[in-house]
């Protein structure tokens, strides 16, 4: 799929970097239809610790973007291959979710929806934020790439000359947007060393 998607779904799982998911949703709003958001309990815990957002407040915020489904809601429309969007992003992607997708185990809604997207030949973007990476984690990400998924690690970038954490968040969200095929300028793109500041 090389064209811009008209619809996307987003899964927010229990890894550091929930702020990137929130920035991604902010950038997507008004650009494409957000078919649904999947939230895990682990993501709620991370949001509480990293951002000081209580679970009920996080759910309310996410519902302002799209219908919200919890990780065990297998009755969600996103659980069915008959109702998949053009693209899906898992941001941040926990190693648990990465492992389930890589092994084809649809035991959570994020994994089930991702596997349905892949089966249909649609775009799946998986954004892990984990370090260091061992053999198991690398093999799981390789398996997803071989299945047609796009792996976008949430890494730091210094060529953008960040002046704040928000600059780094924008960069990470922008890379996910690029992989989804949704061009929204949220970060400074490389134009060569001559460009200057």
Curated annotation (Swiss-Prot):
Recorded family membership: Belongs to the UbiX/PAD1 family.
Signal peptide: none
Organism: Aeropyrum pernix (strain ATCC 700893 / DSM 11879 / JCM 9820 / NBRC 100138 / K1)
Entry keyword set: Flavoprotein, FMN, Prenyltransferase, Transferase
Catalytic activity entry: dimethylallyl phosphate + FMNH2 = prenylated FMNH2 + phosphate
EC id: 2.5.1.129
Molecular function GO terms recorded: flavin prenyltransferase activity
Pfam families: Flavoprotein
Positions bound to dimethylallyl phosphate: 159, 175
InterPro entries, alphabetized: Flavin_trans-like, Flavoprotein, UbiX-like
Function: Flavin prenyltransferase that catalyzes the synthesis of the prenylated FMN cofactor (prenyl-FMN) for 4-hydroxy-3-polyprenylbenzoic acid decarboxylase UbiD. The prenyltransferase is metal-independent and links a dimethylallyl moiety from dimethylallyl monophosphate (DMAP) to the flavin N5 and C6 atoms of FMN.
Name listed for the protein in its UniProt record: Flavin prenyltransferase UbiX
Amino-acid positions noted as binding FMN in the UniProt annotation, renumbered to this chain: 14-16, 40, 94-97, 129
Keyword 4Fe-4S: no
